[in-house]
């Protein structure tokens, strides 16, 4: 059972899940993964709605790659308009040259804001080899101020699994999203 108790437009978040979600600050990348119905998006929207110290940007990838890229550029525009224009000019990366251009931009882009959190919902809908290369490079980037949360139904990339198993990225699975006996009794 998911962490969705009907609290109007909010989700019930147990203390243990709050603690897990709060650990995102220790990582550049966080992955929240569970099958449909576990309340991943609703929990994240509730938890990060008024999270202090971060500019939280929500990008829904439940669309075409081009619409995702447009939304990504609009989110980046809030943080750094000149970089957003460069991303938009390049377009959704569909060639090796585009991938390298995006990697270079991400490696030098810093947030003018103190800290930025980009949450990409339904990331597995648009994840391909090019985006995998881009985000693998961005992981080791020296750009400061950016953290990413990827919401997925399942993780199929061995690179992501390796990051989580080596504790180099945060992984929150259906185990953390499911209600415990204490949550149900509460």
Name each region found by the language model.
Residues 34, 56-65, 91-92:
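A short hydrophobic beta-strand->loop->alpha-helix junction that borders the nucleotide-binding pocket
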Residues 1-22, 86-87:
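Conserved adenine-nucleotide phosphate-binding loops and their immediately adjacent elements
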Residues 23-24, 108-113, 138-145:
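Conserved catalytic network of the ASCE P-loop NTPase/AAA+ motor domain
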Residues 30-58, 74:
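P-loop NTPase Walker A phosphate-binding motif
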Residues 105-131:
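Conserved P-loop NTPase "ATPase switch" module shared by AAA+ and STAND
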Residues 66-89, 107:
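Conserved NTP-binding/hydrolysis module of P-loop NTPases
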Residues 42, 133-186:
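Alpha-helical sensor/transducer elements of the RecA-like P-loop NTPase core
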């Amino acid at each position: 059972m998911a962490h969705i108790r009907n609290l109007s437009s909010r989700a019930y978040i147990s203390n243990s899940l709050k603690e897990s979600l709060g650990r995102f600050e220790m990582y550049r990348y966080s992955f929240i993964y569970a099958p449909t119905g576990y309340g991943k998006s609703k929990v994240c929207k509730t938890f990060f709605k008024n999270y202090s110290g971060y500019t939280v940007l929500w990008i829904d990838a439940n669309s075409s790659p081009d619409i995702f890229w447009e939304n990504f550029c609009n989110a980046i525009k809030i943080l750094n308009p000149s970089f957003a224009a460069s991303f938009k000019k390049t377009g959704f990366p569909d060639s090796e040259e585009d991938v390298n251009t995006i990697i270079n931009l991400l490696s030098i882009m810093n947030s003018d804001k103190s800290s930025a959190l980009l949450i990409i919902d339904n990331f597995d809908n648009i994840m391909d080899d090019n985006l995998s290369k881009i985000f693998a490079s961005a992981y080791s980037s020296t750009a400061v101020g950016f953290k990413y949360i990827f919401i997925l139904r399942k993780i199929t990339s061995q690179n992501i699994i390796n990051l989580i198993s080596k504790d180099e990225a945060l992984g929150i699975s259906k185990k953390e999203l499911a209600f415990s006996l204490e949550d149900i009794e509460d």
